[in-house]
Each structure stands twice: as structure tokens, then as C-alpha cells.
Amino acid sequence: MCTLFKRQVEHRPVEQILINTSREETRVAILDDGLLQDLFIERACARGLVGNVYWGQVVRVLPGMQSAFLDVGLERTAFLHIAEIEGARMDTGTFKPIESLLHEGQRLMVQVAKDPIGTKGARLTTTISLAGRKLVYLPNDSHIGVSQRIEDAALREELRTLATTVRQKDEKGGYIVRTCAEEGATEQEFLSDMAYLARLWDGIRHRAQEVKKPTLLYQDLTLAQRTLRDMVHEGCLLYTSPSPRDRSVSRMPSSA
């Protein structure tokens, strides 16, 4: 395994991650040197929808609002604006008329970008993105980018070069290097992410071919699973009660 880089830090607080799961809720506490820094709670009855991928059907197109409502199998129809439709923006910067892209009864794959609020349904996008540990996969794009939160220009170029080198020449889709790669990234970590995300996307596509009506194709990871993916790193102390890892590992990159 060849490490691209590893930042040196003179003193790094001992980080502790505590995960407590029950049927009702999951609680995650982040501590630095024993001091609470963050507390996250996810209730089973109110789990968010952001990141979920659905097979939806257009039920109404509104040219005046340049938007559409889709049935995705939820209690309320979901909202899709023209700006969230891939391929809708023209070279001039303006958008194609939504009625030229969508029609009632049309079926398409969408992802939740914003949870329902009050009487408003979920907001959708057709730009599908799937997150791994170090990379975000964009199956309908070919671009390789780097998180804008990584500001070091030289580091950004190193990460982009690594992702470009590792990606298979005939591989479809693009990637965005996640902010967490700023602390260190290896070729093997990128390869592991790419393999995991390719399997995940294949599963979603195959399910979309099988379903006959609007339905959920992929549910995003739970709070416990996201914590294992995003926050656990070398040197941190992890405490779980009970352990969520056995239930999570099948949906995580092999490097997790």
C-alpha cells in the first residue's frame, strides 16, 4: 500500500466515538480528550430521506413553475425543479423547458436532496451521487473533482491525479474526492471505494429494471453506519453498545 501523503500533527487530541443503538434510536457522541464535541441522534421513526434513491413516476408537470411532481412511493408526492434535472442547462446558462424533458407518466430514477418539511414533499434531483469513505461516485458524470473544502491547490491536484490514475480507463462515471482525504489517502483506499461504489450502483440499476411501480431503490446508510464510514480513523477510540458493525460491514467499503 502506497500512501500518497500523511499530514504531521504535533498534538492531536485523543478522539473517542461512542455509539449507542436501540430499536428506538441511535446516539453518537464525539469526544476530544474527554470533552463532548458533538452529539448526533437518529430516531428510527423519523429517519431522514436525504440520499435515498427512488424509481419515480411523473404525475404532474408545471411549465409555469418549471417543475414537476413525482410519485416515489412516499405519503406525499415529491418536487423536482428544472435546475435539478441533469442535461437541462444549456451552454447559454439557461434551461430547456421542463415540458420538453418530462411528461406525465414518465418514469425516472431520482434521489432525495432535501427532506419533506411540513406539508411540502421531499425535493428531488436526477443527479445521483453515492458516497464511499474517500470518494463520492457520480454514475452519470465523467468528471473527477475534489471537495471545495480542500483549499490547498497542490494537494487538490495530487488527489485529482491519484483518482484519475486509479480509475479504470473503461469505467463509466465520475468521482469527487471527499474532504476527509485531506488527512491522508492511499491508492488502495481509492480502489476499495471504487469497487464498493461500483457494486452498489450495479445493485441499484438492477433493482430499477425489476420494479413495476414507484418505489425505494436504495436507502442511505444509518447514523451508525455513516459514523463508521466517515469518522472512525487510525488513533481514535471506538465504543459501541451494542456493536452496529456486524450489521454495517456488508454495506461498507472493504477498507472500513
Regions found by a protein language model. Give the residues of each.
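Single-stranded RNA-binding surfaces
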Residues: 1-241, 251
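Positively charged, low-complexity/disordered segments
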Residues: 245-246, 250-256
